[in-house]
Amino acid sequence: MAALRPLVKPKIVKKRTKKFIRHQSDRYVKIKRNWRKPRGIDNRVRRRFKGQILMPNIGYGSNKKTKHMLPSGFRKFLVHNVKELEVLLMCNKSYCAEIAHNVSSKNRKAIVERAAQLAIRVTNPNARLRSEENE
C-alpha cells in the first residue's frame, strides 16, 4: 500500500522557533532553562526593557489552520485500543493515529493491522515491536 498522504498540506510557518528561556538561567546552574514568568517588582524582563530576553505572549501563536499540525500534514489522535481507531475512519485524510505509550505490544500489533485495513496512518507503528531473530 502506498504511503498515506493528507488531504491538504499547507506550509507550516512558526513565528518563533527558538525556545523561551528563563531569566538568569544562563547565569546559575540551579535555575533551569524551562520558562517561568518573572514576577519580581523590579524585574527587567517582566517590564520588557530593550535588550532583555523575550517573554512568550499570544502574538507568537500559530496559525489556526496549521496549529497542532505535524510536518507530514496530519494532526495526532491518541489511540489506546482498536475501538478508538474506528473514530478516525471518516477523517483519515486529516488525522493520524498515535499509539499511547502504555499499550502492550500484543495490542499494538492489532492496532497497526486494523489501521492498515482502514487506511489510517500511524505515527509510531514500530514502537515496542521486537524482531523475529531476537525471540
Swiss-Prot record:
Chain residue numbers at which the record places covalent cross-link Glycyl lysine isopeptide (Lys-Gly) (interchain with G-Cter in SUMO2): 9
N6-succinyllysine, modified sites: 50
Keyword 4Fe-4S in annotation: no
Pfam family membership, one: Ribosomal_L32e
Signal peptide (from-to): none
InterPro entries: Ribosomal_eL32, Ribosomal_eL32_CS, Ribosomal_eL32_sf
Modification sites for Phosphoserine: 62
Annotated GO MF terms: structural constituent of ribosome
Domain of life: Eukaryota
Keywords: Cytoplasm, Isopeptide bond, Phosphoprotein, Ribonucleoprotein, Ribosomal protein, Ubl conjugation
CDD domains in the cross-refs: Ribosomal_L32_L32e
Family per record: Belongs to the eukaryotic ribosomal protein eL32 family.
Subunit and interaction comment: Component of the large ribosomal subunit.
Protein name listed in UniProt: Large ribosomal subunit protein eL32
Source organism (scientific name): Mus musculus (Mouse)
Source organism phylogeny: Eukaryota, Metazoa, Chordata, Craniata, Vertebrata
